[in-house]
Amino acid sequence: MSKEEAIEVEGTVIEPLPNAMFRVELENGHVVLAHISGKMRKYFIKILPGDKVTVELSPYDLTRGRITYRAK
């Protein structure tokens, strides 16, 4: 059984939360809870409110995601 493909969407960080979690507003208006991917943690990439980010969403739970990229 293979994993389902993740859905990649663009969004804007609204507010930081404890434990490297962020509330992100997607381009379609939905608000999701997202955490930082492991590589971003490893290389200490900082994310601030207002940053444009790419979020991966699981097809099973569209309310939570993983931040995989921060736009410059």
From Swiss-Prot:
Source species of the chain: Geobacter sulfurreducens (strain ATCC 51573 / DSM 12127 / PCA)
GO molecular function, one term: ribosome binding
Protein name: Translation initiation factor IF-1
Coiled-coil intervals: none
Matching CDD domains: S1_IF1 (cd04451)
Subcellular location: Cytoplasm
UniProt keyword terms in alphabetical order: Cytoplasm, Initiation factor, Protein biosynthesis, RNA-binding, rRNA-binding
Keyword Transmembrane helix included in the entry's annotation: no
Subunit composition and interactions: Component of the 30S ribosomal translation pre-initiation complex which assembles on the 30S ribosome in the order IF-2 and IF-3, IF-1 and N-formylmethionyl-tRNA(fMet); mRNA recruitment can occur at any time during PIC assembly.
Family: Belongs to the IF-1 family.
